């Protein structure tokens, strides 16, 4: 299966428009969004931009109903009412309403989750570590990947709002090198941490390349990860 990954949107509705074009241009089979739809530098009260971003995400969800969606920390700060850098209290009620509207568009059985699996690839906002799995699902055998993910996806803020969870981990070697869940058998794809171009190290692909500096200047390459979930071959496409 060849798919596109939309990572760390942060109020850039045009990402969904371009991803939709690439679905046709690249003849892709599906899409995954690692979310972080809200929040960007200096836009904490830009009501129109929040609406525009969620409208674009909702249109994409309606056009491609099999898309997999993964909660990011910025999404969950509104869902759970937890403050963090970039969070806008002025937009709390608006974002919660937009999240609910978008959730209603998704097919039954395909809700937004913390971690998603397609074949031998696990997608999450920021990585699923072996340590977190051993704490979250000690009675589930590691080769029962779906059982582990079901357990992780059933958890709430108490177990997710910490640095070891799949929304905060930063498993890149320069930040928090760690053993990933089911290494060698599973590839993991993450966003959250801005990187200088899409890259793979071991069994991890990092693809948050749309982040910007406070003045709006792009930090990274602003390209989409296109991944073959069978061969693990990948490319970046603008």
Regions found by a protein language model. Name each.
Residues 1-4, 116-123, 201-203:
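Beta-strand-turn-beta hairpins that frame and shape the catalytic cleft
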Residues 5-6, 71, 123-124, 190, ...:
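Short hydrophobic beta-strand that contains or immediately precedes a catalytic carboxylate
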Residues 6, 11-99:
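Core catalytic region of metal-dependent phosphoesterases/phosphodiesterases
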Residues 90-108, 112-180:
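Active-site-proximal loop/helix segment associated with metal-binding centers of metalloenzymes
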């Amino acid at each position: 299966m060849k798919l596109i990954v939309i990572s760390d949107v942060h109020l850039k509705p045009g990402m969904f428009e371009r991803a939709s074009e690439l679905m046709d241009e690249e003849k892709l089979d599906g899409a995954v969004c690692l979310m972080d739809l809200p929040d960007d530098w200096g836009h904490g009260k830009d009501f129109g931009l929040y609406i525009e971003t969620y409208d674009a995400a909702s249109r994409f969800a309606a056009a491609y109903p099999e898309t997999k969606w993964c909660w990011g920390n910025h999404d969950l700060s509104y869902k759970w009412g937890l403050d963090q850098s970039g969070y806008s209290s002025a937009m709390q009620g608006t974002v919660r309403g937009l999240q609910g509207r978008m959730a209603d568009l998704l097919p039954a059985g395909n809700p937004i989750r913390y971690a998603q699996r397609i074949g031998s690839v696990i997608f999450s906002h920021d990585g699923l570590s072996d340590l977190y799995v051993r704490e979250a699902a000690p009675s589930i055998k590691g080769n029962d990947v779906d059982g582990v993910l079901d357990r992780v996806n059933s958890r709430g803020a108490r177990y997710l709002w910490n640095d070891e969870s799949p929304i905060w981990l930063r498993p890149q070697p320069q930040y928090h090198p760690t053993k990933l869940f089911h290494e060698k058998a599973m590839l993991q794809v993450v966003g959250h941490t801005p990187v200088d171009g899409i890259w793979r190290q071991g069994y991890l692909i990092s693809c948050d390349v749309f982040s910007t500096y406070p003045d709006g200047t792009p930090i990274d390459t602003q390209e989409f990860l296109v991944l073959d979930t069978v061969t693990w071959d990948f490319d970046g496409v603008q």
